[in-house]
Regions:
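Hydrophobic positions on the alpha1 helix immediately C-terminal to the Walker A/P-loop
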Residues: 37, 41
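Short glycine-rich substrate-engagement loop in P-loop NTPases that contacts/grips substrate
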Residues: 56-85
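Conserved lysine of the Walker
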Residues: 34
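Interdomain hinge/linker elements that couple catalytic modules in large macromolecular machines
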Residues: 3, 149-220
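Structural recognition of the conserved hydrophobic beta-strand(s) that form the central parallel beta-sheet
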Residues: 115-121, 142, 151
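N-terminal pre-Walker A segment at the start of P-loop NTPase domains
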Residues: 1-16
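Short regulatory helix/loop adjacent to the ATP-binding pocket of P-loop NTPases
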Residues: 124-140, 155-156
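Hydrophobic anchor at the beta1->P-loop junction of P-loop NTPases
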Residues: 26
Length: 220
């Protein structure tokens, strides 16, 4: 699938693509498009002449990598790429799935042959633990759900029908919450079902784990 380029964010990150001294940390709520943004960065590197073997995408939610659970597992995996010549561009999706990942990531940063990009849930990466353990050698790029402008442009990109009444489109945008995947669905029922599922996931996995909720019925 051809990816829509979220240029607003890409232009902020491009200057750091080849920087091996800085870890690029992409944060944002669940399903806001962090993984797709990293895939877009990888695509741009390949289009600019970087070899495929030098672009290493590790999705820790995928079957291929779901056995990688600890810092030692991650270290062993990254060590397996040592024989690749030149800078290794490493993309790690959902980094919070790895226990004590910070020291390993920092060690490979110090080696100087790795340009590292990581994504993860706000509930962990914005907790202050990241800043402490990565010793300030990172830059955070916070990603949001689609702006209304992006929402319209993305619908154009994927050749989706756009209502001639801009207010109607704005209402659709508000209902869908700006989550990129809703654009794939044609049925408003499917869009609402997906959005509700995402919001419930954010509440259960992020909000409830980090803060004490006194009036749960407010979220129902």
């Amino acid at each position: 699938m051809i990816l829509y380029k979220r240029e607003e964010y890409l232009k902020r990150i491009r200057g750091f693509y080849h920087d091996t001294e800085i870890i690029k940390v992409i944060t944002g709520v669940r399903r806001c498009g962090k993984s797709s943004l990293m895939l877009t960065i990888k695509e741009e590197l390949l289009n600019n002449g970087i070899n495929e073997e030098n672009c290493i995408f590790i999705d820790l939610d995928s079957r291929k990598y779901n056995t990688i659970k600890t810092d030692k597992d991650l270290e062993k995996l990254l060590d397996s790429y040592d024989n690749i010549k030149g800078i290794k561009y490493v993309f790690i999706d959902e980094i919070q799935n790895i226990q004590n990942f910070e020291e390993v990531i920092n060690a490979f940063r110090i080696d100087g042959e790795y340009s590292i990009f990581i994504t993860g849930s706000n509930s962990y990466l914005l907790s202050g633990e990241l800043a402490t353990k990565l010793t300030g050698r990172y830059i955070e790029f916070e990603i949001f759900t689609l702006s209304f402008y992006e929402y319209i442009e993305m619908k154009k990109f994927y050749k989706k029908t756009i209502d001639t009444n801009i207010i109607s489109e704005l209402n659709n945008y508000i209902i869908e919450g700006g989550f990129p995947k809703t654009i794939q669905y044609d049925s408003i029922i499917d869009k609402r079902t997906y959005t509700r599922a995402v919001v419930e996931e954010i509440f259960e996995k992020d909000i409830k784990k980090r803060v004490k909720v006194r009036t749960i019925e407010t979220f129902n």
